[in-house]
Amino acid sequence: MIFREQLQKQWNLNIVDLRPDATWQGFIQRFGRDLPQQDPDLCCYIRKVQPMQVAMDKLDAWITGIRRDQTANRAQSQILEYKRDGLLRIAPLLNWTNADIENYILEYGLPRHPLPLKQYPSVGCKPCTRPIRPGESDRAGRWSGKGKTECGLHTDLFNRDTLTADDFKLEIRDE
């Protein structure tokens, strides 16, 4: 969060915080502490996908930093892609590699996030992310051992025709 706040101040960014309907404590009370391990798809939907869907309902376009070399699913993506709900997804870095990213950082003197130096080149939520080991892919620390490679934001894992935000709305709200 310190890095985010530094960038926000340095570049005068308008950062919007998205949160699920319930706090972590409310989430644990409803689903239990083990949901991230027992049903990571449901956990990702409640804590990440659903809040993004609510925010994106107000948008015409979404710019994302996904790359083809990250997952098999992303390899099939297009730079400009209309999603089922009419949202235009723009992926300007889709054909970039790690070397392209590194060169861009050096050329433009961009600040570096501290987590890749701690072996976290790809970060998700705390229960489902671990540091990578030597020789592993950048995303190997995400959902390790679960056979999962995507949270659902960049897939049709959650069909909006059959699931709505109300399907998983939490009754508990901690302030």
What label would you give each PLM region?
Residues 1-175:
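Nucleotide-activated chemistry modules centered on ATP-dependent adenylation/adenylyltransferase
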